[in-house]
Amino acid sequence: MLNSWPLAKDLQVLVEIVHSGSFSAAAATLGQTPAFVTKRIQILENTLATTLLNRSARGVALTESGQRCYEHALEILTQYQRLVDDVTQIKTRPEGMIRIGCSFGFGRSHIAPAITELMRNYPELQVYFELFDRQIDLVQDNIDLDIRINDEIPDYYIAHLLTKNKRILCAAPEYLQKYPQPQSLQELSRHDCLVTKERDMTHGIWELGNGQEKKSVKVSGHLSSNSGEIVLQWALEGKGIMLRSEWDVLPFLESGKLVQVLPEYAQSANIWAVYREPLYRSMKLRVCVEFLAAWCQQRLGKPDEGYQVM
């Protein structure tokens, strides 16, 4: 049992060091001296009786204990900010511009309606919503919050899981009447595959797993596009086999307009909110992430238990 609890300001110092990459940069962000930052980290390490950071000529790195402390610190500081907002009623209504990015298909079908509802609840917000057919850089593309259908998130971003999702193989019954349904991934090379080149997808390569192994399959066909909506329409018209997100094809599977192919295989493609700064720093960012999480969970299902907004 600890003799004293870690102070919120010391946890904030740790978070700032991780995000800025150095003690001096963290000090500048906090408006303090490097000596102050060093002292607060020493106090935090003494309080927890463990080393949190390793310093070298190449920079600063978290220890295993430091990584755990950092993750909890993000959660604690976000909860602390909620407490301050609720009790003091200061800035309880988020305001100002927030720039949100997303892919075309999911952006139009889910995020755009969610933003409409968001604005009803928080009319003081201003939202600029931009759709991309490529992976973006939050800084270079000037985006505060990016909604990504991709599990490979760079570690210099913060990511919050909105909901689970996977991509599955589908085709129309009309197509499968003309051509024998593939019985293995290798047989996909004999089929007309509708290739999509969206934000995170490598053109002509499908990464598929069955829970035991993952394989890369090279596919081709007469039709390809950077629009998932167009590829879905081609599949419905019986033009070939496609790999699409479950949220996009589920209504057509239920109606019988599409049939799942090789159902034991799928591609993990969870839906994430991705941003640069911890949520405790920005009420408008926190409100947007929490609202979109609730929106997606209500319509697409909740992710696994145990995650936190950070």
UniProtKB/Swiss-Prot annotation:
Q: Which GO terms describe its molecular function?
A: DNA-binding transcription factor activity; sequence-specific DNA binding
Q: Name one Pfam family in it.
A: HTH_1
The protein in question is named HTH-type transcriptional activator TtdR
Q: Which SUPFAM superfamilies match?
A: Periplasmic binding protein-like II, Winged helix' DNA-binding domain
The family assignment reads:
Belongs to the LysR transcriptional regulatory family.
Keyword terms? Activator, DNA-binding, Transcription, Transcription regulation
Q: Does the keyword Transcription apply?
A: yes
* Superkingdom assignment: Bacteria
Q: Which NCBIfam families match?
A: PRK09801.1
- Give GO BP annotations, semicolon-separated: DNA-templated transcription
Q: Where's the HTH lysR-type domain?
A: 6-63
Q: Which Gene3D superfamilies does the UniProt entry name for this protein?
A: 3.40.190.290, Winged helix-like DNA-binding domain superfamily/Winged helix DNA-binding domain (1.10.10.10)
Q: What does this protein do?
A: Positive regulator required for L-tartrate-dependent anaerobic growth on glycerol. Induces expression of the ttdA-ttdB-ygjE operon.
Portion annotated as DNA-binding: 23-42
